[in-house]
């Protein structure tokens, strides 16, 4: 909008990510709350609105909708608009002086001061006549009639009745419906918000290698075999099953057991070394089955209430068809050989790098986009992206936007264990979720500091942390050779501190045998088939199932951004809570951080956060033990053990009285 004298200032807009370069994230069903400083010189009464629309293929023809903003004080304004559909929205702010309300405000002061207001009444009549014309243009004849009649009366000599008409709030309401926006100012940026589907904010992931589904450590399983795991995963309470790469595996420089550089003839290799004579990123490993078998696996998973997430690893083995067909897509050394991949200190001799920003990048990027769309066509709507921080963020921004323009339901999880700013940049350019440093946060202060950072604005506007206590790559020190208590408490933390969490197969069996001196599993499943005994003594399957059931049935635990930490007098006990925005579901949680010994703590319950009075008695339902208690007051004593290291209390306040009984009257 062009500059005008007396312009309104619009500043401090929130949410606004990096001056509007990136979209903020929300979920369908939420309302996008927007705040801004809106002010003008003088004493004019201002009006501010949010202009918003959903971006569609016909967006250029779509009219913008407007919702009013509320004045909060100190020139701060707030408004919100609904996110009813999955996809991208645009929004901005427009504000202008409400000339008629400004006039009525000045008129009242002059009347109260006993001033002659004949001239002011004529000014008001002129303002109303302008509103009449705008009402007629808007085809609102009733409004035009009301405004016109009032304008005629204001041209009569002043009287108490006439002043009552002029100052009537109802007249100002009608006049403000047809404002003079000639002095309006529109914010100089059009901002974006992306509304993801619900699983972006609430989901529970289970990772397993389908090739080990036979569970004998010898026989390469098929997708049909892997379908046999789905009831088990469902019983554990997971709604997303994540599969490592399912494509043909290269033979050149194939890795042997425990990442050995010398593979035996029967070694299955790392599934991240993608591509062989049987095909590349659009093919499935022949020992797993066919593309039709994969589609059947996806459909069977859906029948169990489980979504399939696929690993998206944009890298190739030296045997990948791309290497021969498109050598221009790869990085070459001065001697002409193709570079192998590295993620220092790790080196991947069985993988070669794409030349992401080379002369052939347009055709490379287009092909990789077609890979994603190929798997979307097979029923995959969630991708876990391998090492995205080693590829250009420009590529991810381009790819994710392109895919979501056609398929807004597609989710992308960033597997980037790297520097904080790089991880956050990946969230900004579009990744739906991200792995986190939770894997290495074990104690009270560091857990609270980190979770407060990633679950509160501004970081939570673009970054959703998916908490994993383990991965095939990472067996953290805290879990190495640990007992079930360690696995229970870390699962409880992951599943309640965030609304999205995941674990790699074997966690429920308390598998914790490391390679000495490393954070890696011995006999890692990345390089061999594993014989999983799902009934292994000492497993915590029931604990995991109860945890996921509690998450599923209590909406407070579906929330990502409502996490709040509360006071515990024991540094070995973390106390926190979550609630739905309307307060209809509240859950308090206490988790022991000691896997070896019992811990007691005095918890200070946040009565104001609960909405409870100090003298009020309320019920708590402990979800892991299914025990109910009555609490009163702010202080509660708790004892946690390695066998029961977490307590999850759903809070119920007694609100009903006899007045609500059907026959009270």
Curated annotation (Swiss-Prot):
<feature type="site" description="Transition state stabilizer">
    <location>
        <position position="473"/>
    </location>
</feature>
<feature type="active site" description="Nucleophile">
    <location>
        <position position="386"/>
    </location>
</feature>
<dbReference type="GO" id="GO:0004553">
    <property type="term" value="F:hydrolase activity, hydrolyzing O-glycosyl compounds"/>
</dbReference>
<comment type="similarity">
    <text>Belongs to the glycosyl hydrolase 13 family. GlgE subfamily.</text>
</comment>
<dbReference type="Pfam" id="PF11896">
    <property type="entry name" value="GlgE_dom_N_S"/>
</dbReference>
<keyword id="KW-0328">Glycosyltransferase</keyword>
<feature type="binding site">
    <location>
        <begin position="526"/>
        <end position="527"/>
    </location>
    <ligand>
        <name>alpha-maltose 1-phosphate</name>
    </ligand>
</feature>
<dbReference type="InterPro" id="IPR026585">
    <property type="entry name" value="GlgE"/>
</dbReference>
<dbReference type="GO" id="GO:0030979">
    <property type="term" value="P:alpha-glucan biosynthetic process"/>
</dbReference>
<dbReference type="InterPro" id="IPR013780">
    <property type="entry name" value="Glyco_hydro_b"/>
</dbReference>
<dbReference type="InterPro" id="IPR021828">
    <property type="entry name" value="GlgE_dom_N/S"/>
</dbReference>
<comment type="subunit">
    <text>Homodimer.</text>
</comment>
<protein>
    <recommendedName>
        <fullName>Alpha-1,4-glucan:maltose-1-phosphate maltosyltransferase</fullName>
        <ecNumber>2.4.99.16</ecNumber>
    </recommendedName>
</protein>
<feature type="binding site">
    <location>
        <position position="255"/>
    </location>
    <ligand>
        <name>alpha-maltose 1-phosphate</name>
    </ligand>
</feature>
<dbReference type="GO" id="GO:0016758">
    <property type="term" value="F:hexosyltransferase activity"/>
</dbReference>
<dbReference type="Pfam" id="PF21702">
    <property type="entry name" value="GLGE_C"/>
</dbReference>
<feature type="binding site">
    <location>
        <position position="387"/>
    </location>
    <ligand>
        <name>alpha-maltose 1-phosphate</name>
    </ligand>
</feature>
<dbReference type="Pfam" id="PF00128">
    <property type="entry name" value="Alpha-amylase"/>
</dbReference>
<feature type="binding site">
    <location>
        <position position="315"/>
    </location>
    <ligand>
        <name>alpha-maltose 1-phosphate</name>
    </ligand>
</feature>
<dbReference type="InterPro" id="IPR017853">
    <property type="entry name" value="Glycoside_hydrolase_SF"/>
</dbReference>
<keyword id="KW-0808">Transferase</keyword>
<dbReference type="InterPro" id="IPR006047">
    <property type="entry name" value="Glyco_hydro_13_cat_dom"/>
</dbReference>
<keyword id="KW-0119">Carbohydrate metabolism</keyword>
<comment type="function">
    <text>Maltosyltransferase that uses maltose 1-phosphate (M1P) as the sugar donor to elongate linear or branched alpha-(1-&gt;4)-glucans. Is involved in a branched alpha-glucan biosynthetic pathway from trehalose, together with TreS, Mak and GlgB.</text>
</comment>
<dbReference type="InterPro" id="IPR049171">
    <property type="entry name" value="GLGE_C"/>
</dbReference>
<feature type="binding site">
    <location>
        <position position="350"/>
    </location>
    <ligand>
        <name>alpha-maltose 1-phosphate</name>
    </ligand>
</feature>
<feature type="active site" description="Proton donor">
    <location>
        <position position="415"/>
    </location>
</feature>
<dbReference type="InterPro" id="IPR013783">
    <property type="entry name" value="Ig-like_fold"/>
</dbReference>
């Amino acid at each position: 909008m062009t500059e005008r004298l007396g312009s309104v200032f619009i500043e401090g807009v929130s949410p606004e990510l990096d001056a509007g370069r990136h979209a903020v994230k929300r979920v369908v069903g939420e309302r996008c709350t927007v705040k801004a400083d809106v002010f003008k010189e003088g004493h004019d009464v201002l009006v501010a609105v949010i202009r918003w629309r959903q971006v569609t293929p016909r967006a250029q023809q779509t009219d913008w909708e407007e919702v009013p903003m509320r004045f909060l004080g100190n020139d701060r304004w707030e408004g919100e608009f609904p996110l009813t559909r999955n996809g991208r929205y645009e929004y901005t702010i427009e504000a202008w002086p409400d000339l008629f309300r400004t006039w009525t405000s000045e008129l009242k002061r002059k009347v109260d001061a006993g001033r002659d207001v004949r001239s002011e009444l004529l000014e008001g009549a002129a303002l109303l006549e302008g509103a009449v014309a705008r009402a007629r243009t808007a085809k609102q004849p009733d409004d035009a009639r009301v405004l016109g009649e009032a304008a005629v009366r204001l041209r009569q000599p002043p009287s108490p009745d006439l002043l009552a008409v002029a100052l009537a709030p109802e007249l100002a309401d009608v006049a403000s419906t047809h404002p003079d926006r000639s002095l309006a100012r529109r914010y100089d940026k059009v901002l974006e918000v992306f509304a993801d589907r619900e699983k972006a904010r609430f989901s529970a992931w289970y990772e397993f290698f389908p090739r080990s589904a036979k569970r004998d450590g010898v026989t390469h399983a098929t997708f049909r075999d892997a379908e046999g795991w789905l009831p088990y995963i469902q019983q554990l309470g997971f709604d997303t099953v994540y599969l490592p790469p399912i494509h043909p595996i290269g033979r050149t420089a194939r890795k042997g057991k425990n990442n050995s550089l010398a593979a035996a003839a029967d070694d299955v290799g790392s599934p991240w070394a993608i591509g062989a004579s049987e095909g590349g990123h659009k093919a499935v490993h022949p020992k797993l089955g066919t593309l039709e078998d994969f589609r059947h696996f996806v459909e069977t998973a859906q029948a169990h209430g489980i979504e399939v997430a696929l690993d998206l690893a944009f890298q190739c083995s030296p045997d990948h068809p791309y290497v021969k067909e498109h050598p221009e897509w790869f990085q070459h050394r001065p001697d002409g050989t193709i570079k192998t991949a590295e993620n220092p200190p790790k080196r991947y001799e069985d993988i070669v790098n794409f030349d992401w920003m080379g002369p052939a990048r347009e055709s490379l990027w287009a092909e990789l986009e077609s890979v994603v769309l190929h798997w979307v066509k097979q029923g995959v709507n969630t991708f876990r992206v391998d090492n995205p921080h080693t590829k250009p963020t420009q590529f991810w921004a381009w790819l994710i936007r392109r895919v979501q323009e056609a398929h807004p339901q597609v989710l992308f999880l960033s597997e980037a264990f790297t520097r904080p700013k790089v991880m956050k940049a990946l969230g900004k350019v579009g990744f739906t979720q991200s792995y986190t440093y939770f894997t290495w946060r074990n104690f009270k202060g560091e857990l609270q500091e980190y979770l407060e950072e990633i679950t509160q604005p501004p970081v939570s506007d673009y970054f959703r942390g998916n908490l994993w206590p383990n991965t095939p790559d990472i067996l953290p020190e805290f879990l190495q050779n640990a007992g079930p208590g360690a696995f229970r408490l870390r699962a409880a933390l992951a599943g309640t501190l965030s609304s999205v969490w995941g674990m790699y197969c074997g966690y429920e069996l308390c598998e914790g045998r490391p390679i000495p001196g490393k954070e890696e599993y011995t006999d890692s499943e990345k390089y061999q088939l594993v014989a999983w005994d799902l009934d292994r003594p000492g497993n915590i399957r029931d604990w995991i199932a109860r945890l996921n059931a509690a998450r599923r049935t209590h909406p407070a635990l579906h929330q990502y951004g409502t996490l709040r930490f509360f006071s515990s007098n024991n540094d070995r006990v973390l106390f926190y809570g979550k609630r739905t925005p309307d307060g209809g579901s509240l859950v308090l949680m206490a988790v022991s951080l000691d896997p070896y010994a019992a811990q007691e703590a005095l918890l200070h319950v946040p009565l104001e956060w609960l909405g409870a009075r100090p003298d009020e008695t309320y019920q708590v339902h402990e979800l892991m033990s299914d025990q109910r208690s009555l609490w009163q007051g702010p202080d509660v004593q708790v004892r946690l053990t390695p066998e029961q290291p977490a307590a999850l209390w759903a809070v119920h306040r007694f609100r009903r009285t006899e007045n609500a009984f059907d026959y009270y009257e």
